[in-house]
Amino acid sequence: MTKTTKTMNPKFYLVLALTAVLASNAYGAVVDIDGNAMFHESYYVLPVIRGRGGGLTLAGRGGQPCPYDIVQESSEVDEGIPVKFSNWRLKVAFVPESQNLNIETDVGATICIQSTYWRVGEFDHERKQYFVVAGPKPEGFGQDSLKSFFKIEKSGEDAYKFVFCPRTCDSGNPKCSDVGIFIDELGVRRLALSDKPFLVMFKKANVTEVSSKTM
């Protein structure tokens, strides 16, 4: 008695391959300045437009050292502190465009002894702004953690922007806001929700650079 072995139809594998390609094309990978797809590594966030500050770092507000806000270096030659991206729902290894994800400033230690995940803070009534601040690691998808989700979206041919879409449990289509730059009374360039986006590009950081960063 001869056993027959079932073989998969080649069309089945073709469908699987096409499905994977379509998924990656629907949500393209964010790429760095070398044109490489970005993954779970550290990257500097740099301005596309030169002469208006450098990379991103951490700073207090109103002359106080703590807690931290996310700010832009004043000098364009200073790349700041790299960031890491995580927690996107799409089942892909690369950092996807237009998907909610978490952003963490990748610093070894801080004098404020606090986590450095990005989140949108409470409304600053004095400055009439919603600033992007450093906060705790988001836990799950609860109401408070939703303040820590941002999207990276293409803006033109060679630039990206950060977008905040505050989806709540009872919201349909959330109203999205771009993340821009607000220059405060001390001249500090702070990330804040804005109708004028801060256009950026990403540069991969090496391990030595990341391990040496402290605040």
UniProtKB/Swiss-Prot annotation:
Gene Ontology CC: endoplasmic reticulum; mitochondrion; secretory vesicle
Signal peptide: 1-28
Alphabetized CDD domains for the sequence: beta-trefoil_STI_AtTPI-like
SUPFAM superfamilies for the chain: STI-like (SSF50386)
Entry-linked Pfam families: Kunitz_legume
GO terms assigned for molecular function: cysteine-type endopeptidase inhibitor activity; endopeptidase inhibitor activity; serine-type endopeptidase inhibitor activity
Disulfide bonds: 66-112, 165-176
Record GO biological process: defense response to bacterium; programmed cell death; response to hydrogen peroxide; response to insect; response to molecule of bacterial origin; response to molecule of fungal origin; response to nematode; response to salicylic acid
Annotated compartments: Endoplasmic reticulum
Tissue-specific expression: Expressed in roots.
Glycosylation sites per record: 206
Ranges in a coiled coil: none
Induction info: Down-regulated after root-knot nematode infection. Accumulates locally within 72 hours after P.brassicae butterflies oviposition. Induced late in response to bacterial and fungal elicitors (e.g. Pst DC3000 and Ecc culture filtrates), and upon wounding, salicylic acid (SA) and hydrogen peroxide H(2)O(2) treatments. Induced by infestation with spider mites.
Keyword Disulfide bond: yes
Record's keyword terms, sorted: Apoptosis, Disulfide bond, Endoplasmic reticulum, Glycoprotein, Plant defense, Protease inhibitor, Serine protease inhibitor, Signal, Thiol protease inhibitor
Disruption phenotype: Enhanced lesion development after infiltration of leaf tissue with the programmed cell death (PCD)-eliciting fungal toxin fumonisin B1 (FB1) or the avirulent bacterial pathogen P.syringae pv. tomato DC3000 carrying avrB (Pst avrB). Enhanced resistance to the virulent pathogen E.carotovora subsp. carotovora SCC1.
Entry similarity comment: Belongs to the protease inhibitor I3 (leguminous Kunitz-type inhibitor) family.
Job description of the protein: Exhibits Kunitz trypsin protease inhibitor activity. Involved in modulating programmed cell death (PCD) in plant-pathogen interactions. Can inhibit both serine proteases and cysteine proteases. May be involved in the modulation of the proteases that participate in the hydrolysis of dietary proteins in the gut of spider mites.
Protein name: Kunitz trypsin inhibitor 4
